[in-house]
Amino acid sequence: MKILYPGTFDPLTNGHLDLIERAEKIFGNLVVAVLENTSKTPTFNLERRIIQIKYSLSHLPNIEIISYSGLTVDCANDLKANLILRGLRAMSDFEYELQIAHTNKSLNNDIETIFLSTNTNYSFLSSSLVKEVAKFGGEINHMVPPSVEKDLKEYFK
């Protein structure tokens, strides 16, 4: 079974990292798929985000990191992945993610989506929030891995 965990990861947060670590324990392997979303201007380009993720996940040998563009369901099809992993922080996430899961299922009936609730220590985190705190010089070391913290401080100085 191949499991896909897609996202923009702009930037990777400790919430993402925790979810990846927990999924690796449950499933034994995971493909982290970094989206190149051409309709948005990311803080970090695709190459930098992949480097941040590789560095932050170097202790997990069963994680594959790839990039993709377009529909997540197409990425899953290309990889022959039959399970998409998504994290849930709050009920509002569930409503949005359920809609996406149903859309993916309508595009490929063999695709299933599994939800993992976020660790309560990270339930408040989002990439947007982290960038906002970093932009104004707030402390982010408890929100992101060290390599991401360094990059954000450099970006916003």
Swiss-Prot record:
GO terms for molecular function: ATP binding; pantetheine-phosphate adenylyltransferase activity. Substrate binds at T8, K40, T72, R86. It catalyses: (R)-4'-phosphopantetheine + ATP + H(+) = 3'-dephospho-CoA + diphosphate. GO terms for biological process: coenzyme A biosynthetic process. The record marks H16 as: Transition state stabilizer. InterPro entries: Cyt_trans-like, PPAT, Rossmann-like_a/b/a_fold. Pfam families: CTP_transf_like. The gene is coaD. It is an enzyme of class 2 (transferase). Keywords: ATP-binding, Coenzyme A biosynthesis, Cytoplasm, Magnesium, Nucleotide-binding, Nucleotidyltransferase, Transferase. It comes from the Bacteria. This is Phosphopantetheine adenylyltransferase. One of its GO terms (cellular component) is cytoplasm. Its cofactor is Mg(2+). Its EC number is 2.7.7.3. Reversibly transfers an adenylyl group from ATP to 4'-phosphopantetheine, yielding dephospho-CoA (dPCoA) and pyrophosphate. Homohexamer. It is found in: Cytoplasm. Belongs to the bacterial CoaD family. It comes from Prochlorococcus marinus (strain MIT 9312).
